[in-house]
A protein has these predicted regions:
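Conserved short histidine dyad/triad with adjacent acidic residue
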Residues: 30-35, 43-60, 83, 90-94
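Glycine- and acidic-residue-biased ligand/ion/polar-headgroup-sensing regions
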Residues: 52, 61-76
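Short, low-complexity cationic-aromatic patches
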Residues: 58-63, 136
Length: 141
């Protein structure tokens, strides 16, 4: 394999992106990198901001993901997690509903599952023009 076959590093500053509507109420995102037709295996990687009281329903994914809590406290299952906590969800996984009384900020990285090959979804989840009711969301993927 020659150097021509390798891709260059990319850099993006969070201030260069605007907050976008995430599919769950009380949540906004800045995905600095995300899948596109030209780059279908790119990760969803960026920030998710939560308003106090924000949560989302139990659901499942075929991709893998890592969350790093930067601000706030999040109840996930029986445990309360705060700043400095990193959570890893292998593929496939069920995602217990995180909820926050304080509001908060997380670094999100969702990537193609090494076991399932499932890819994260950007369009219609992290960049919504208008949020749908939770009951209308697909929680099976």
């Amino acid at each position: 394999m020659s150097n021509r076959d390798h891709q260059p590093m990319e850099a993006m500053h969070a201030d260069d992106r605007s907050w976008e509507t995430l599919r769950w109420p009380g949540q906004e995102s800045k995905m600095l990198f995300h899948p596109s037709p030209e780059r279908p295996t790119a990760p969803n990687a960026g920030l998710v901001r939560y308003e106090p009281g924000s949560h989302h329903p139990f659901h499942k994914h075929d991709f893998a993901q890592v969350w790093y809590i930067l601000e706030g406290e999040f109840q996930i299952g029986e445990a309360l997690h705060g700043p400095g906590t990193m959570l890893f969800y292998p593929d496939p996984h069920f995602e217990a509903p995180p909820s926050t009384r304080t509001g908060g900020l997380m670094l999100f990285v969702q990537y193609q599952g090494p076991t399932t090959g499932g890819r994260p979804i950007y369009d219609g989840r992290f960049n919504m023009k208008e949020r749908r009711a939770i009951a209308e969301e697909n929680v099976e993927r």
